[in-house]
Amino acid sequence: MARLVAFDMDGTLLMPDHHLGEKTLSTLARLRERDITLTFATGRHALEMQHILGALSLDAYLITGNGTRVHSLEGELLHRDDLPADVAELVLYQQWDTRASMHIFNDDGWFTGKESPALLQVFVYSGFRYQIIDVKKMPLGSVTKICFCGDHDDLTRLQIQLYEALGERAHLCFSATDCLEVLPVGCNKGAALTVRTQHLGLSLRDCMAFGDAMNDREMLGSVGSGFIMGNAMPQLRAELPHLPVIGHCRNQAVSHYLTHWLDYPHLPYSPE
C-alpha cells in the first residue's frame, strides 16, 4: 500500500471553480486516519498553500512553485531552487514577441507589471493576488520562477524564442494550456518529491501521485503509482501512455479513485 500520496492542485484536486469539494476533503481526512502522508505538489505559491492548509486544518507537506520550494508539516523550508540571476535578467528585460502577460515569483509573493484581473478567478478560494511593480526593478537574485499567461498558440511560439535565448540554462514547461513557466534547470515536482521522500526515509515506489499537466510529468512518471486526470493535457497522455487515466476533476475523480482504493484495494477500478 502507498505510504505517501502527492496531489497536483489545479485541474486535479481542485474542481473547475478552483475549490476543494466536500468528498475530496473527506477522502483526505481518511488518508490521514490511515497514517498516509499527504503532499500537495503545485505551481502555486507557498504563502497561498500555507494559508489554505491552515484554513482547512490539513496536515500536509508542500511542494510549491513547481518544485522550487519544499516545506515540512511545520512550515520549515527543506529545499529551495532559484533561477540564476542572469537567466532572470534575460527573461525579464528581453522584448519577446508575445501578447502573453509576464508574472514573477519570489518568497515575498507574486508580481506583475500590469493588471490581469481575469487571472484572479483562479485564486478565489484563497484570495491570493499579485502585486503591481516595475518589472525592471525586480531583485534578480531571488526569483523562483517566471510565468507567461496567454493563448496557447502564442505561448508555443514564445517557447521557441525562450529555448533559442536560454538554451540549457532553464527548464520550460506548460503548467496549463495557457501558462508557460521558466524554472531552474532540473527543477520539477518529481525532483522535489525525491527530496521529500528521502527526508521521510521512503522510496518513490512507496508513493502515489495524481496530475493533469506537463508540469506533473516527472512526478507521475517516477512514483510507484501515477494517475492521469481525464481532463489532462493531451501532451501528458502522449508522454506517459502507460499510466491509467481516471475521471474529470469536476467530478472529484481523485476522491472517487481513492475511496475505491481504501475500501476495495484488491478489486479493479472503473472511473465510471
Curated annotation (Swiss-Prot):
Q: Which cofactor does it need?
A: Mg(2+)
Which chemical reaction does it catalyze? 4-amino-2-methyl-5-(diphosphooxymethyl)pyrimidine + H2O = 4-amino-2-methyl-5-(phosphooxymethyl)pyrimidine + phosphate + H(+)
Active-site residues per Swiss-Prot or TrEMBL entry:
D8 (nucleophile)
GO terms, molecular function:
4-amino-5-hydroxymethyl-2-methylpyrimidine diphosphatase activity; magnesium ion binding; phosphatase activity
- The superkingdom listed in its UniProt entry is Bacteria
Q: Where are the transmembrane segments?
A: none
The positions annotated for binding Mg(2+) are: D8, D10, D212
Q: What are the entry keywords?
A: Hydrolase, Magnesium, Metal-binding
Instruction: Fetch the Pfam families from UniProt.
Output: Hydrolase_3 (PF08282)
Q: What is its EC number?
A: 3.6.1.-
Which Gene3D superfamilies does the entry mention? 3.30.1240.10, HAD superfamily/HAD-like (3.40.50.1000)
Q: Name the HAMAP family on file.
A: HMP_PP_phosphat
| Protein task | Catalyzes the hydrolysis of 4-amino-2-methyl-5-hydroxymethylpyrimidine pyrophosphate (HMP-PP) to 4-amino-2-methyl-5-hydroxymethylpyrimidine phosphate (HMP-P).
What family, per the record?
A: Belongs to the HAD-like hydrolase superfamily. Cof family.
Q: What is this protein called?
A: HMP-PP phosphatase
Species of provenance: Shigella flexneri
Which gene carries the instructions for this protein? cof
